[in-house]
């Protein structure tokens, strides 16, 4: 009788283990599918460039946030550009294939415009600028061993591991996107997907990438997040944008 009970318990543990594994795999596939189908969201994007030789004087970059709609690309972003020890407030739009930017505030504000990207790619676009929505990164969701999993109630966070194999893969993907063959003295990343298992929906995407190329003293850190996924986004241009000057470059 004791052996029979032990046999039943062993069988149950195998079944439960299989269910747990299948549950993780099915969630990863849902994350992959949902991410490919994202149409809009609330975006944050930032870039920080620093140089060891220049110290804080050489720090440049931007911090922007706003709404983005994919295919065709439309966005509204507010934030600041930093450089030479100064911050410049900016407001950027892409609407109907035209890129608009407002530099400065109040009476000193100046509007510029130029033809927008024809390939739906832009530095401030989460879809084209993030690691999360890259097809090669999404393919890594096919293997659950690639991911660390943490659970908080109904929310499950999948974070790409940092094994040598995966780090080399991310380097390869990054170079492929840049169409360059760079070698790095520093390379670190975080790539996360937050999934709500109750609603069966993706809730948040996050990434950061910090790199230093061999033979240089400069370091670049890029970060981004996408939340309020598939929110309704209606981009309206301010009246003053009608007076925007044409950008030559």
Briefly describe each language-model feature range.
Residues 1-8:
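Positively charged n-region of N-terminal signal peptides that target proteins for export
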Residues 20-249:
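Subset-of-secretome marker
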Residues 15-18:
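C-terminal motif of bacterial Sec signal peptides marking the signal peptidase cleavage site
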Residues 11:
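Nucleotide-cofactor and metal-assisted catalytic machinery
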């Amino acid at each position: 009788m004791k052996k029979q009970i032990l046999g039943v318990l062993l069988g149950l543990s195998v079944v439960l283990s299989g269910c747990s594994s299948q549950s993780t795999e099915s969630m990863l596939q849902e994350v992959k599918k949902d991410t490919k189908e994202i149409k809009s969201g609330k975006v944050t994007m930032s870039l920080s460039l620093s140089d060891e030789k220049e110290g804080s004087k050489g720090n440049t970059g931007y911090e922007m946030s706003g709404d983005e709609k994919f295919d065709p690309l439309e966005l509204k972003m507010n934030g600041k550009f930093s450089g030479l020890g100064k911050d410049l407030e900016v407001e950027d739009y892409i609407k109907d294939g035209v890129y608009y930017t407002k530099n400065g505030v109040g009476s000193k504000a100046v509007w510029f415009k130029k033809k927008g990207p024809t390939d739906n790619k832009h530095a401030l676009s989460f879809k084209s600028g993030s690691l999360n929505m890259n097809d090669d990164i999404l393919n890594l969701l096919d293997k659950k061993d690639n991911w660390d999993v943490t659970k908080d109630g109904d929310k499950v966070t999948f974070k790409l591991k940092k094994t040598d194999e995966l780090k080399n893969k991310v380097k390869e993907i990054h170079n492929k996107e840049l169409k360059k063959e760079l070698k790095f003295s520093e390379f670190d990343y975080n790539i996360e997907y937050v999934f709500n298992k109750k609603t069966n929906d993706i809730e948040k995407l996050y990434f950061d990438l910090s790199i230093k190329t061999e033979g240089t003293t400069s370091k670049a850190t890029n970060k981004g997040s996408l939340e309020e996924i598939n929110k309704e986004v209606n981009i309206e241009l301010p009246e003053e944008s009608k007076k925007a000057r044409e950008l030559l470059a």
